Amino acid sequence: SSAASDVYKRQVVYHANYIKFFERARSEFLSDNKISQSELKKNDQAFVIKSVNIKYIAAAELGDNIYVESEVEKKSNARMIFNQKVINCDNEKEYAIGVVEVCFINLVTKKPQKFPDDLLLIFD
């Protein structure tokens, strides 16, 4: 991924865009594992963010090639906590580290719902 579309006039990545990078990485992971968020939505199910905690270490700049490393720290029937890092592809420099708490809900009731078994399996 390139940080090119997410930069300030000063040529550094705007702080809020690191949340977008985290989101893209989680979405790509689901897609790569054949979990369709649009299909979940048709079944009145969705992922929602309960909390995000980010520590900014350095600013990514225009032209930096980055990737996001993600791991599930903890999971329960309706909640997962991800540790995520935005890292430079060329020199492994860390730009930001984050902890993201994701819940699974029923869109009609707006209440937590158990993850489907196939989804839980990909996080083992």
Regions found by a protein language model. Name each.
Residues 1-8:
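Short, small-residue-biased leader/transition segments that mark boundaries at the very start
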Residues 16-18:
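Early exported N-terminus immediately downstream of N-terminal targeting peptides
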Residues 25:
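Helix-loop element at the rim of GNAT/NAT acetyltransferase active sites that forms part
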Residues 29-67, 71-80, 98:
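Hydrophobic beta-strand-centered segment that forms part of the acyl-chain substrate-binding groove
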Residues 31, 61-62, 73-124:
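HotDog/MaoC-like acyl-thioester-processing domains
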